[in-house]
Amino acid sequence: MDLTPLTQALDQHRTVEVIGNSGAGLTTLAAQAHNEWPGAAVVQQDATAHVSYLRDTVIEEVALGLEQRGTPIPEMRRRCERVLSAAGLTELAERHPAQLSGGQTRRLAIAAVAVLEPELLLLDAPFAGLDPTSATHIIRLLEA
């Protein structure tokens, strides 16, 4: 798959939306783009695949990648609070991830990747099946 049009669009814009019908190859495009850009991160449509459930709280789940990278605690706290706020998850920060609804889990999965500040963030159908409030929170998170 030729990624030249995507590369050109990303050179000109901060956000690019690629839309198409089911089976059009968008998931394949996301996987290939992830391989082409080392600083890219992908959140697949099944958000539960991105949540480890090994952490006791939502904020610990968001902090996991930062911990693994050795991010200093004050910086980790600042970044986690910022993405949780943008994702509308601040009030759920101390809740266990398994207690979240589907939309909340999707927001958690995106927040846990966005907090790492990847060079390129690829979201596979980020709004599929979401209520308007959850979709708005994801938009805010992506703009943060």
Please name every model-derived segment.
Residues 74-92:
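Conserved ABC ATPase "signature" region
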Residues 96-100, 104:
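Conserved ABC ATPase signature
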Residues 110:
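Hydrophobic anchor residue at the start of the ABC signature
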Residues 117:
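Conserved catalytic motifs of ABC-family nucleotide-binding domains
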Residues 121-124:
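Catalytic Walker B motif of ABC-type/P-loop ATPase nucleotide-binding domains
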Residues 127-128:
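Short loop immediately C-terminal to the Walker-B catalytic DE motif
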Residues 131:
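ABC-family nucleotide-binding domains
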